[in-house]
């Protein structure tokens, strides 16, 4: 028995009164050798409750979150593409496309969210923190770009931008005045932007670039077609992702189509902070900016703990057993994560047997998170489910959208860790399960959703299959040699 579950975070800000309860034996933590008693066989408490973990803490003053554009203005951003203006073909540089997208975003934000604070950081062979009103721009260059602590202090000492209602005209002038030249100090610029955004949890950084970082700190440009970035740079971007997540900052990366930006490293930075990684054509930059901006962070420092009875165990996680905790970090209203769990194999934990058909099991989720006002919260959701050994009942009641989401997330997680064969097998197993479920009386909508999902996932599964086939051929060749 394998089951998937999904969590939506749309109601994290709701608060329900808690109920004080006392139990003698925890349903989830009881000894594996002790069978559940009548008092512990069912979970006590509310099905959905939210608790304030820090009732004595004073709420933080809520200020509008910060949005920082971190824009590449290196020499390669001068490369042009042909576009039609009416019927007349014209050429625009990559930077011109980025400028146009930013100007559109600023205009819309000034109308819809005039209190939002929007800042601009640009980078080539130096990093520029663009000023506004009476504050002049600050330039970081040379040896300053290899000193991480100095860069953080520079970000902390630079004043936060006032609301967009006051800075719109100045910001538009700064955007229009950009020009391309020099190298790509992406690493230092990312650190400065994240440090500056860390003043207000829930802030966003949007990095837009067309090339690999090629200055000392976070350098991703190395010699040789098969060479990997040096270990220090890999560690740098990993640590940067951890730092951003710990400060409640979401980092998204927009790479311009047709360029090599080493998205494996930058992707991990974005993934750790629940940001987006997008490869966009120059014409689509504004749309991508808007999607990132509109997806507001509603909570930070989120972790999710799944608790199962001893008769069940989690699957596909680093932690074994009937309990797992996953660090989620920043969450938006559309954030969804999934878990897999199933019946424990006989003899794997003392004498615990599989759940008995006709019985019931309870599953609990504990969500810890921090609100924008600084209060730490705990949300507890408990579900009580009947156990059955009738496969037709299970298959006819499966929620296909959850299976599809879990398949995508589980395969992606395996592929990111280099386990391509396991990712391929995971996708095939879930696909077979969905096809079996579709044999039962399913709605036309279910079948259409599955068809669309299949069309999206087929190229990915084919790529995994081709990659694992090449690995197998290379392995066979090495054995022959």
Regions found by a protein language model. Give the residues of each.
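Acidic, polar loop-rich interaction surfaces within structured domains
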Residues: 1, 216-219, 226, 230-376
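Short, non-ligating residues that shape and space the ligands of small metal-coordination modules
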Residues: 9, 15-18, 35-36, 214
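Von Willebrand factor
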Residues: 30, 61-160, 186-192, 199-209, ...
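Cys/His-coordinated zinc-binding microdomains
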Residues: 3-5, 10-11, 27-30
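Intrinsically disordered, low-complexity regions enriched in proline, serine, glycine
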Residues: 35-39, 77-82, 86, 110-121, ...
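Long, acidic serine/threonine- and proline-rich intrinsically disordered regions
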Residues: 1, 345-481
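Short, charged loop segments at secondary-structure junctions
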Residues: 124-187, 212-230, 239-240, 247-249, ...
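Acidic, polar low-complexity linker/tail segments
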Residues: 19-23, 30-69, 73-85
């Amino acid at each position: 028995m394998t089951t998937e579950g999904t969590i939506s975070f749309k109601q994290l800000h709701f608060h329900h009164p808690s109920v004080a309860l006392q139990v003698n034996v925890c349903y989830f933590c009881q000894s594996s050798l002790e069978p559940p008693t009548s008092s512990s066989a069912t979970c006590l408490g509310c099905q959905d409750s939210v608790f304030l973990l820090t009732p004595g803490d004073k709420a933080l003053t809520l200020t509008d979150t910060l949005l920082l554009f971190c824009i590449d203005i290196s020499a390669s951003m001068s490369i042009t593409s042909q576009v039609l203006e009416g019927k007349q073909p014209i050429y625009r540089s990559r930077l011109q496309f980025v400028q146009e997208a930013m100007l559109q975003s600023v205009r819309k934000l000034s109308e819809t969210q005039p209190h939002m604070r929007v800042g601009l950081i640009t980078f080539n062979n130096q990093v520029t923190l663009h000023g506004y009103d009476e504050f002049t721009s600050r330039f970081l260059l040379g040896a300053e770009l290899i000193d991480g602590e100095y860069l953080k202090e520079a970000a902390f000492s630079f004043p936060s931008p006032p609301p967009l209602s006051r800075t719109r005209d100045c910001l538009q002038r700064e955007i229009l005045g950009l020009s391309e030249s020099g190298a790509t100090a992406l690493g230092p610029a990312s650190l400065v932007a994240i440090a500056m955004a860390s003043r207000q949890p829930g802030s966003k950084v949007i990095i837009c670039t067309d090339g690999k970082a090629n200055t000392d700190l976070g350098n991703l440009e190395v010699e040789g077609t098969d060479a990997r970035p040096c270990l220090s740079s890999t560690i740098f971007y990993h640590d940067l992702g951890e730092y951003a997540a710990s400060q409640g900052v979401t980092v998204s990366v927009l790479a311009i189509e047709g360029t090599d930006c080493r998205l494996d490293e930058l992707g991990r930075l974005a993934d750790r902070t629940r940001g987006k990684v997008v490869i966009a054509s120059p014409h689509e930059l504004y749309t991508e900016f808007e999607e990132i901006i509109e997806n507001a962070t509603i909570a930070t420092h989120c972790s999710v703990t799944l608790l199962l009875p001893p008769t069940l165990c989690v699957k596909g996680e680093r932690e074994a057993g009937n309990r797992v905790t996953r660090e989620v970090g920043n969450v938006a209203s559309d954030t969804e994560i999934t878990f897999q769990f199933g019946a424990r194999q006989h003899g794997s934990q003392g004498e615990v047997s599989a759940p008995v058909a006709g019985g019931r099991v309870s599953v609990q989720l504990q969500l810890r998170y921090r609100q924008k006002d600084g209060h730490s919260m705990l949300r507890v959701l408990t579900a009580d489910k009947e156990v059955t050994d009738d496969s037709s009942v299970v298959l006819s009641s499966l929620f296909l959208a959850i299976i599809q989401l879990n398949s995508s997330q589980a395969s992606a997680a395996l592929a990111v860790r280099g386990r391509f064969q396991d990712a391929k097998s995971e996708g095939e197993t879930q696909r077979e399960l969905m096809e079996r479920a579709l044999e039962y009386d399913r709605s036309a909508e279910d079948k259409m959703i599955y068809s669309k999902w299949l069309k999206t996932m087929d190229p990915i599964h084919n790529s995994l299959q081709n990659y694992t086939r090449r690995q197998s051929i290379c392995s066979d060749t090495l054995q022959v040699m």
